[in-house]
Regions:
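Alpha-helix termination/capping residues and helix-transition junctions
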Residues: 1, 27-29, 64, 88
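Glycine-rich adenosine-cofactor-binding loop
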Residues: 3-39
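A short secondary-structure junction signal
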Residues: 20-22, 47, 82
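Phosphate-bearing ligand-interacting subdomains
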Residues: 49-141
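A glycine-biased structural micro-motif
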Residues: 42-45
């Protein structure tokens, strides 16, 4: 990647907090500029140098800052409404951690839906394949 991007994170619950704490956005050429939440105890604080603002400030923040990417970690009940705010205010791409598929038909917005269940199912499949290989090998060795 030959240029960096500025991003915001919406939803500083378990997944959002874990991403902020453990994922190196900078190593991927992304500056996490701000995070947004509705929880009063988080608003106005900073986490790892990232200010946490009220979700009510999201639209104004996007209008006044050059932000290309959004990391979406909100409950599925509000995901569509938050996505609408993001897409109407200049966000070019969404990294979606909600537990619903986000699609933007006829939209230039890029959406990467992250599915933890798909990853777990893939792992389960590969473990099953490996166990089948071990069983077949053990059966051959018994003969």
């Amino acid at each position: 990647m030959d240029r960096g991007y500025r991003a915001i994170l919406v939803g500083v619950g378990n997944i959002g907090h874990a991403l902020m704490d453990n994922f190196s956005f900078a190593d991927c050429g992304v500056e996490l500029a701000a995070a947004f939440d509705i929880k009063e105890s988080l608003i106005g604080t900073e986490f790892k140098g990232v200010p946490i603002l009220a979700e009510a400030e999201l639209e104004g923040y996007l209008k006044n800052n050059d932000i290309a990417l959004a990391v979406l970690c909100v409950p599925k009940e509000v995901a569509v409404n938050v996505t609408k705010i993001l897409t109407e205010n200049g966000i070019e791409a969404i990294w979606n951690f909600t537990n619903m598929e986000l699609t933007e038909p006829n939209s230039p917005i890029i959406v990467e839906n992250v599915h933890f269940s798909d990853s777990l199912l893939s792992l389960s499949y590969f473990v099953s394949e490996r166990m089948d290989e071990h069983t077949a090998e053990a059966s051959r060795n018994e003969k």
